Curated annotation (Swiss-Prot):
One of its GO terms (biological process) is mRNA 3'-splice site recognition. It comes from Eremothecium gossypii (strain ATCC 10895 / CBS 109.51 / FGSC 9923 / NRRL Y-1056). The keyword Cytoplasm applies. Signal peptide: none annotated. This is Pre-mRNA-splicing factor ISY1. Involved in nuclear pre-mRNA splicing. One of its GO terms (molecular function) is first spliceosomal transesterification activity. The gene is ISY1. Associated with the spliceosome. It is found in: Cytoplasm; Nucleus. The keyword Cytoplasm applies. Its main location: cytoplasm.
Length: 240
């Protein structure tokens, strides 16, 4: 009997919602399943209402993930659901901004803060999810990487400071930026003198005469000549 009463009340509630929607335009979006294909929603007001439902679900999940009675598996499930909701919210906001010419929610700072959480390797972690062992390990690695980057930046700043100090102490003379008076004239005169020497040397006969052969000897002839030369040297050494 009670099931029939509940069923009748449910039918009555749906009928009342339908009447209210037809007469005043009111629609309880929380009782409907959100569309997964956001691009199919062409009405700006309807898209904004669906986004509001996502924001409400995010608020409820953020409150739920702080519950101290949750175990690690439940915490991970809620945190994964929060990340999914954030992605859905971004899809609605992008559709509203680009396709429906609606407001840009990225620049709006009112209402529920839905940009919270700690982002680690592209994943947001909320509430007690930050206490999970593997998340603590990721946080430690992130902190070590941050310290390493800060140390690297500090070393670069120290090196720049040393370079500036060297430039101030050594001055432009060390780097050859200031040319002493008469240096350019001397270098030009010396260059002309060296060019004259090279030209005069080019006109003289070379000190080493390169023989001209009617034909080049073969490899066998060269080897025979080397053998004969070694034989003569050996005979001279032995006084033969």
């Amino acid at each position: 009997m009670s099931r029939n009463v509940d069923k009748a009340n449910s039918v009555l509630a749906r009928y009342q919602e339908l009447v209210a929607e037809n007469t005043s335009g009111y629609k309880d979006y929380s009782r409907f399943k959100r569309p997964t294909a956001v691009h199919r929603i062409s009405n700006l007001e309807e898209a904004q209402r669906w986004r509001a439902e996502v924001v409400k679900d995010i608020g409820n999940k953020v409150t739920q993930i702080h519950d101290p009675s949750l175990n690690e598996m439940q915490i991970e499930d809620i945190n994964n659901e929060l990340n999914r909701l954030f992605q859905e919210k971004m899809r609605w906001e992008s559709h509203i901004r680009r396709n429906l010419r609606g407001p840009d929610y990225r620049r709006m700072k009112q209402g529920l803060n839905t940009t919270g959480g700690t982002v680690i390797n592209g994943t947001r972690y909320f509430g007690r999810a930050l206490e999970l062992p593997h998340v603590q390990e990721l946080l430690q690695q992130q902190q070590q990487q941050r310290v390493k980057q800060q140390n690297q930046k500090q070393r670069e700043q120290e090196l720049r400071a040393k370079v500036r100090q060297w430039e101030e102490e050594l001055g432009p003379d060390y780097y050859g930026e200031d040319v002493p008076p008469g240096m350019q004239e001397y270098e030009a005169q010396r260059s002309r003198e060296l060019q004259d020497i090279l030209r005069s040397a080019a006109g003289r006969a070379p000190q080493v005469q390169i023989p001209l052969f009617e034909r080049l000897p073969t490899q066998e002839e060269v080897e025979g000549w080397l053998v004969e030369r070694r034989r003569k040297r050996l005979q001279e050494r032995l006084d033969l």
